[in-house]
Amino acid sequence: MALPDFSMRQLLEAGVHFGHQTHRWNPKMEPFLFGDRNNIHIIDLAQTVPLLHQALVTVRDVVAGGGRVLFVGTKRQASDPVAAAARQCAQYYINHRWLGGMLTNWKTISNSIRRLRQLDEMLAGEAKGLTKKEVLNLTRERDKLERAIGGIKDMGGLPDLIFVIDTNKEEIAIQEARKLGIAVVAILDSNSNPDGIAFPVPGNDDAARAISLYCDLVSRAVIDGISQSQSASGVDVGAEAEPAVEIPAAAEA
């Protein structure tokens, strides 16, 4: 495995360079902007390319060292790509709503995870001795918990890095990560606040193609990190009967 490659053309065709309307900008993003066209800010991809590469290197190195990565994207257009990318590389995700304290109050979240596992076991066992109403109520509780924390139920502890789509919407997640010293890789649109983002990646955070591209690249960087970790521990990845994770070819946008 190798760190995923990407081209300026891919970024352009995915619309990574398109920011928001000029009146919606955050002035702190000015250093990352190329200019504006038709009252739309244009993000400077000459900066995005090296910053995205550095972010991918960081993700790979964290995972190669045994770290966990949490994908965070709860807006509608990010929800599915975030979950799919995290599953593809055997990592973790929050893709519906960030619950306050999800990182800073991990003990409470752990209790909710234990309850979710308990419900899974109860309902998997054909719910013997339970009435239809009890089964319905337990199923509803399970589904609610699964939607909220299903993506982190196997995480086993705090993540070592979070990857964020839309820093404005995920402001609480970023605040919690910073408080705990957890590294943050984040996509910064023209209306974002870059303060406190250790690994900023200037780019459109609304276009579906752009979001899918970011998620795919980060997922493949994780897989490269897993491969390095296995190699370092003496596992012959090439000799495995089946690859642990199927890696799709990078889609040329």
From Swiss-Prot:
The keyword Ribosomal protein is assigned to this record: yes
NCBIfam families, alphabetized: rpsB_bact
GO annotation terms (biological process): translation
GO cellular component, one term: cytosolic small ribosomal subunit
This protein's name: Small ribosomal subunit protein uS2
HAMAP family according to UniProt: Ribosomal_uS2_B (MF_00291_B)
Keyword Metal-binding among UniProt keywords: no
GO molecular function, one term: structural constituent of ribosome
Lineage, top ranks: Bacteria, Pseudomonadati, Pseudomonadota, Alphaproteobacteria, Hyphomicrobiales
Family as reported in the entry's similarity comment: Belongs to the universal ribosomal protein uS2 family.
Top-rank lineage group of the source organism: Bacteria
Classification via InterPro entries: Ribosomal_uS2, Ribosomal_uS2_bac/mit/plastid, Ribosomal_uS2_CS, Ribosomal_uS2_flav_dom_sf
Keywords for this protein: Ribonucleoprotein, Ribosomal protein
